[in-house]
Regions:
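Extreme N-terminal tail/first-helix region
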Residues: 1-17
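Short, contiguous alpha-helical
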Residues: 32-90, 124-178
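Short, flexible helix-adjacent loops and helix caps
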Residues: 24-31
Length: 178
């Protein structure tokens, strides 16, 4: 596996595992409870992540397929992706409110297990799309993020990991408040 893909997948896998431990540490009876009117329950946060990762997985698959068709070069760069990922501190800052698009807001009617299963499936599909891009110079493919601006596909994968970490903290906060 190309070192840059391996690096972002290692980060992504670590954040996924941490999120799973956080969610599983919440008592079952608290997973569907919102901490305040209009706030997302832990299961609602997971439902949001399922929606977002479905969209980003589709984005990566589509952009990589288009890159292949247009002759995207093989990856020759072995430098660290994470050292150039400047969005990480911004997304990790829970004091900075970031409002997601309405499309990715949870309906909050899924049972916690159903929400987790939807998220796990979306995450697996996204991860598979990243593995499928192994060996290609996906740092050359740039797509705008609605809040953080242009990100290359490596940075999109790092964003997903940071997004999971941000929401793991939100889940801890929500569970503590109910």
């Amino acid at each position: 596996m190309q070192p840059r893909i391996k690096e972002v997948l290692t980060y992504l896998d670590g954040q996924y595992e941490a999120l799973q431990k956080t969610f599983e540490s919440i008592p079952i009876e608290k997973r569907s409870k919102s901490p305040a009117p209009g706030a997302w329950s832990p299961a609602g946060v997971i439902e949001h992540l399922a929606s977002v990762e479905t969209s980003i997985g589709r984005l990566i698959s589509t952009r990589v397929a288009a890159g292949r068709e247009s002759g995207l070069a093989p990856e020759t760069d072995h430098s660290s992706v994470m050292e150039t990922y400047t969005v990480g501190p911004l997304i990790g800052d829970r004091t900075r409110k970031i409002v997601s698009g309405e499309r990715s807001h949870p309906v909050q009617q899924l049972a916690p297990d159903a929400a987790w299963n939807a998220f796990a499936a979306a995450h697996a599909t996204l991860r598979s799309a990243v593995v499928d891009a192994d060996g290609l110079a996906i740092g050359e493919i740039v797509h705008p993020h609605p809040v953080f601006g242009p990100l290359n596909l490596y940075h999109w994968v790092a964003f997903v990991g940071g997004h999971e970490a941000r929401h793991a903290e939100q889940i801890r906060e929500a569970a503590a408040a109910v």
